[in-house]
Amino acid sequence: MPRKGHIAKRDVLPDPVYNSKVVTKLINNVMEDGKKGVAQKICYDAFQIINEKTGRDAMEVFEEAMNNIMPLLEVKARRIGGANYQVPIEVRPERRQTLGLRWLLAASRKRGEKYMRERLAGELMDAANNTGAAVKKREDTHKMAEANKAFAHYRY
């Protein structure tokens, strides 16, 4: 925590093709070793694959997928009287988006397709259909929160 007050959030510029800040964040998360051009190509190619395979607008599929991935609740460890409790808490909107993108990319990277553009497109289409590893991660997180509902009164 900083000693000199609050640090302002840096604003992300919307991407040039879809004019969306969320797509910019996706590109920034896909990026490795500062290679933004490569990351943009991967994302835009994945969106092109989605357009071809589904016949729907890629942004629609992307937004639907993100809504199916982003968690509403998560658990946070809290130490009380020598015991650690998993306390369910609501997730702030900014963190919801961050976790959604993180889980989407983790699930994409674990997939079996040869190219990242295909893995990302596949995971986005699966998530839009409420299947896939990223959606399962969200369901598991919600189950953990539900199972530990009894400790909700220890909330921060």
From Swiss-Prot:
GO terms for cellular component: small ribosomal subunit. Belongs to the universal ribosomal protein uS7 family. Part of the 30S ribosomal subunit. Contacts proteins S9 and S11. HAMAP family: Ribosomal_uS7_B (MF_00480_B). GO terms for biological process: translation. One of the primary rRNA binding proteins, it binds directly to 16S rRNA where it nucleates assembly of the head domain of the 30S subunit. Is located at the subunit interface close to the decoding center, probably blocks exit of the E-site tRNA. InterPro entries: Ribosomal_uS7 (IPR000235), Ribosomal_uS7_bac/org-type (IPR005717), Ribosomal_uS7_CS (IPR020606), Ribosomal_uS7_dom (IPR023798), Ribosomal_uS7_dom_sf (IPR036823). GO terms for molecular function: rRNA binding; structural constituent of ribosome; tRNA binding. Keywords: Ribonucleoprotein, Ribosomal protein, RNA-binding, rRNA-binding, tRNA-binding. This is Small ribosomal subunit protein uS7. PANTHER family: RIBOSOMAL PROTEIN S7 (PTHR11205). NCBIfam families: rpsG_bact (TIGR01029). PROSITE patterns: RIBOSOMAL_S7 (PS00052).
